[in-house]
Amino acid sequence: MSGEQVATGLYWDPDTWQLARAAYVADLDHDPDCPTGFLWWLHRTIELHVARGASGRAALGVAPQTVRSVGRGFNRHHPLKVSTRAALEQALLDDRVEHGRVLSRSAWVHEAVTVAVARSRDRLGRDLDLVPGRLPNRPVRSGVG
């Protein structure tokens, strides 16, 4: 990834983290526009959610992120493009001003990922397969298209 980046700390609950990874891998084979890296997939997920606008995001009715038990989640720092981070921050403001939705950055990304996971599951036509271990650095893609 080129250009300026800003480290962005996000809280992940283990279930959402695993589903995000599974959606990324499924999208590699079933979405011709899927980027070939998880970080780029996360960028696209955020940018698509921004593009829905505050009303579109509110209409989705995604259940808020819940902490199921203390100590289960974890923080990760993701190097986001400055433009993506700025768009995310503006979306947070728009959601609060236009719809009274007060979300943390992590909760907002959780919402974006939840929608991306559902779309990936729809493309696949079944539940997503969880990915054990580390994601591949340079994944082989199927002939999507």
Task: Report each predicted region and the residues it spans.
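Short Lys/Arg-rich basic patches
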Residues: M1-Y24, L39, A58-L92, S106, ...
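Conserved aromatic-histidine-acidic binding/catalytic patches
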Residues: T8, C34, R76, V97, ...
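Alpha-helix C-capping/helix-to-loop hinge sites
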Residues: A23-D31, A91-H99
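Short, basic amphipathic alpha-helical segments that act as recognition/interaction helices
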Residues: H30-L60, G100-L130
